[in-house]
Amino acid sequence: MLQPINHVLTHPDDIPSMPRAAKEYLQVRFNQAYVMESGEYRALRAAGYSESFIAGVMHGLYLASRTLDEIEVRKEQLRQE
């Protein structure tokens, strides 16, 4: 197992700090509206990717965005404990 993965699994409360600007930028880039407006969706279609593949990409972006939200919530919970 990769060491960074092992570290997160064995130390789930060791959450790195992330500047708000970086989080907001990533939230935008992981947003479906951004993917549609930026032309990335059309580029995937033009490249011949299937609708199910593109749906998987979109779901992956959704999960990445949720992870950013969960980091913020968990850090707040740890501060309150």
From Swiss-Prot:
Classification via Pfam families: T7-like_Y65
InterPro entries, A to Z: Phage_T7-like_6.5
Name assigned to this protein: Uncharacterized gene 6.5 protein
Source species of the chain: Enterobacteria phage T3 (Bacteriophage T3)
